[in-house]
C-alpha cells in the first residue's frame, strides 16, 4: 500500500460516514485510486474497543467496515449526493496475526472485489508500520 496524502480528517470525516463518537473508528481518509481506498486510525487507550491497552478483534472489524463506508461516502460526496447507510452482511476468511496496542497507527486498504447492485464484496489489509495485522 502506498502512503498517500490525507484528504479528509477530523470532523470532515462525518461527511463520509454515519458514525459519531465514541463509535468513530477512522480518523484519516487518504482517497481512492482505481478500486482501492485507504484510511487510517490512531489507536488510543480510551478507544471503545480497547481492552487493557489493546485494540480487540471487534475494533478491527469495525475499523474495516468504516473504512469501506468512507470509500462509498467519498464517492457520494464527490457526486454531491446524500451518503447512504451501509451494513456488514458477513465477514469471511478473516485472519488477524496480532492485535495492535494503544499508540499504534493503522493504515488500511480496502479493495473492491465485486459490486452487484447495492452489495459490495471487499478485501481489506490493515497494517501497522507496513506489518500486516
Task: Cite the ranges covered by each PLM segment.
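Catalytic strand-loop segment that frames the active site of acyl-thioester-processing enzymes
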Residues: 21-56
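HotDog/MaoC-like acyl-thioester-processing domains
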Residues: 2-3, 70, 101-104, 111-133
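Hydrophobic core residues within well-ordered beta-strands of beta-rich domains
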Residues: 23-25, 106, 120
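Conserved positions in beta-strands of structured domains
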Residues: 14, 27-30, 97, 111-113, ...
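A conserved, well-ordered hydrophobic junction motif at loop->secondary-structure transitions
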Residues: 42-76
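Hydrophobic beta-strand-centered segment that forms part of the acyl-chain substrate-binding groove
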Residues: 4-7, 70-107
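Short aromatic-glycine motifs in intrinsically disordered, low-complexity regions
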Residues: 10-20
Amino acid at each position: 500500500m502506498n502512503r498517500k496524502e490525507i484528504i479528509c480528517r477530523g470532523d470532515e470525516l462525518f461527511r463520509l460516514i454515519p458514525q459519531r463518537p465514541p463509535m468513530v473508528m477512522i480518523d484519516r481518509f487518504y482517497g481512492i485510486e482505481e478500486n482501492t481506498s485507504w484510511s487510517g486510525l490512531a489507536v488510543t487507550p480510551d478507544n471503545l474497543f480497547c481492552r487493557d491497552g489493546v485494540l480487540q478483534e471487534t475494533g478491527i472489524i469495525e475499523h474495516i467496515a468504516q473504512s469501506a463506508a468512507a470509500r462509498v461516502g467519498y464517492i457520494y460526496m464527490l457526486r454531491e449526493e446524500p451518503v447512504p447507510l451501509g451494513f456488514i452482511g458477513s465477514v469471511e476468511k478473516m485472519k488477524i496475526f496480532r492485535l495492535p496496542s494503544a499508540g499504534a497507527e493503522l493504515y488500511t486498504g480496502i479493495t473492491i472485489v465485486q459490486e452487484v447492485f447495492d452489495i459490495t464484496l471487499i478485501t481489506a489489509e490493515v497494517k501497522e508500520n507496513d506489518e500486516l495485522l
